[in-house]
Curated annotation (Swiss-Prot):
The active site is at residue 325. Disulfide bonds: none annotated. [2Fe-2S] cluster binds at residue 325. The modification N6-(pyridoxal phosphate)lysine is found at residue 202. This is NifS/IcsS protein homolog. Pfam families: Aminotran_5. Pyridoxal 5'-phosphate binds at residues 69-70, 149, 178, 199-201, 237. Transmembrane segments: none annotated. Its cofactor is pyridoxal 5'-phosphate. Keywords: Iron, Iron-sulfur, Metal-binding, Pyridoxal phosphate. GO terms for molecular function: catalytic activity; iron-sulfur cluster binding; metal ion binding. Belongs to the class-V pyridoxal-phosphate-dependent aminotransferase family. NifS/IscS subfamily. It comes from the Bacteria. It comes from Lactobacillus delbrueckii subsp. bulgaricus (strain ATCC 11842 / DSM 20081 / BCRC 10696 / JCM 1002 / NBRC 13953 / NCIMB 11778 / NCTC 12712 / WDCM 00102 / Lb 14).
Amino acid sequence: MIYFDNSATTKMAPKALETYSQVVTKIWGNPSSLHKLGDRAHGLLEASRKQVADLLGVNTDEIYFTSGGTESNNTAIKGTAWAKREFGKHIITSSVEHASVANTFTELENLGFRVTRLPVDKEGRVNPEDLKAALDKDTTLVSIMGVNNEIGTIQPIKEISEILADYPNIHFHVDNVQALGKGIWDQVFTSRVDMMSFSSHKFHGPRGIGILYKKRGRMLMPLCEGGGQEKGLRSGTENLAAIAAMAKAARLLLTDEKEKADREYAIKEKISKYLAGKPGIHIFSPLKADFAPHILCFALEGIRGETLVHTLEDQDIYISTTSACASKKADEASTLVAMKTPDAIATSAVRLSFDESNTLEEADEFIAAFDEIYQHFSKINHLGE
């Protein structure tokens, strides 16, 4: 089996699974309980929080545990919008965000907020000058993803941070679900970033658990009320086993991070060089420093993306059509549409996404399998004629 769909989800790391099993069987007390079982659970909860904070280079009290990237994004966006609505109801995002951001902005728009969606260029990147022009006295929030989940574009977070340095009251949220452990941290995080979202299952941790980074002093309204866990921002008994396993997975991921990212890039480079220049092939994830090393999106004209996915699946090779979170919906190639890619090409797009366990030998096997498909469809569609 060749699994090139790691941006959709990753296999849980054995050591993270071991941690999960140990915690769920041995440290099963409620962290809010006053007795020693609760104390022990609370101690592990806070140790995990500190471990995550240290790995990200932030303060321990700025880390909040959620159910995943979607909840983190919703909490950051809705929490800011509602908490600051008396100061202004203008919020800004891009036209290429993950559905958990894009749909949240649409919901707020329907509730009376004024939304600006920044356009992107032919590489799916926003222009910081467009953001600068959009800011006004009513702006309370800017939310721009760090790495695009469909084609791997790294957004200009540094340049945006420099602009927002002159607007200290505006909250700046970055969806960094696709960015952790890819050797690009200095491109997607600055001291001006107020909030970030992360999802455990994207970096070999368990599903159903995630992280919200919120800078000290930034006010958010919680999405739900209850027992006041997570400093009142996220009520509900903490999923301690998943939290501890996620912290372990993050530590493993960030060990030898550059070496792992280089291995992923080598696979992307090998396949990209094979694809380059072939008639009917369109590559949307070039070999450039402002693209993530682990994502390769391309299209083969004349064959729908899902057809290619299932054809390769028959050979035990697993890829996806752009975002797995929207791949069964009609708007699956939203980033390519925002880039003004012709529909016939956008619907042919597929995404390969790698992790540190993938190998160059797997890349060779993929190339061999894909080449047979390419030769077959080239004849049918008269590519290159």
